[in-house]
């Protein structure tokens, strides 16, 4: 098996530190808001990685953290007039609901930053002892970036090129703008813990270093996360962990490509962030999972209605091939499974793996056409087994195809309403009335108001 290592910028033959066992840490969420589809892509990608490694016989220890204390949590809690702990707990429950809705496997361990404050303090003390950290004039403790000679080795940028990242605060207390905070001195009304440097709370980056190494040891096999975390977060994790423990931190780094919305960057400033909950109102979970895994995990992917519809049609092909076949136990594999493994062993090449699954669909249909139902059923069982690695083909064909028809009907209704609104805007009343009649024939009642057009199926 070969996996692309962001650290070396090349595919490497994957050999776990301990034979047959894989220790994997993935950065989780800061719990102050709903999970969006960008988070969803990263979660589903690493869910696929865990499922595949386990299918290949590895004993995987999968750790994904929760950041439950952070500036953003404190700010949002203040706006909501609730405690940071209450806000975090509420969104942790929401996160778990979304995780279940996405069919993402729960991690083996899900550490929270607030549970690891003693380990965080211990690591900061080591950094101070090793002279990689200092206390600023304001009482915060900072990491001395220029003291760590390998800084920039993950993002492949020289220190002179680097600018303070979006989540690295500029402060007069720093010796250098690139230095980042390890421990923040307590402010009135904020959560705080005792430390050798006074009351305060951990910085964001140090949390992941302490949690991952405390649970998995150092070094461990794979550290994953979204590409947006590569710098400064993951770069800072390496610096802290290797300066503190004086040994390598992680063997292999994996980064999931970013998700775009209609080929535009997803951002709050553009107002185009889509939550998982919104996405699952529009599309079935299998359609969403298929779409999010359809491109190579390292490449950017554009979320659009057209791409989701393509995903729905692709899944229809799978389920139409399975419909009406007897269910048999999957006991033996064919060359298709070998070729599937070959694709996935090449840096989790899901586009080639999906192409192979469609080959299987064509073969199933040929068997069916030739009335070789037993052969079709055996291959269908193999197809379902491979689909499970992607969290797909979990419905009965009847369930999915009926749901897909309803979804298609809703999309058609929305399309007709948009066309009618355009006609009304142009004062083309004849066309608007014709479309209203079409909708009535579909059993749809519409109501126009100053807020727009609402509809319901009767």
Swiss-Prot record:
A motif ('HIGH' region) lies at residues 29-39. CDD domains: Anticodon_Ia_Cys, CysRS_core. It is found in: Cytoplasm. It comes from the Bacteria. It catalyses: tRNA(Cys) + L-cysteine + ATP = L-cysteinyl-tRNA(Cys) + AMP + diphosphate. Its EC number is 6.1.1.16. Binds 1 zinc ion per subunit. ATP binds at residue 268. Gene3D superfamilies: Cysteine-tRNA ligase, C-terminal anti-codon recognition domain, HUPs. GO terms for biological process: cysteinyl-tRNA aminoacylation. Keywords: Aminoacyl-tRNA synthetase, ATP-binding, Cytoplasm, Ligase, Metal-binding, Nucleotide-binding, Protein biosynthesis, Zinc. Its cofactor is Zn(2+). A motif ('KMSKS' region) lies at residues 265-269. One of its GO terms (cellular component) is cytosol. Zn(2+) binds at residues 27, 208, 233, 237. Disulfide bonds: none annotated. GO terms for molecular function: ATP binding; cysteine-tRNA ligase activity; zinc ion binding. Monomer. Belongs to the class-I aminoacyl-tRNA synthetase family. This is Cysteine--tRNA ligase. The lineage of its organism: Bacteria, Pseudomonadati, Pseudomonadota, Gammaproteobacteria, Legionellales.
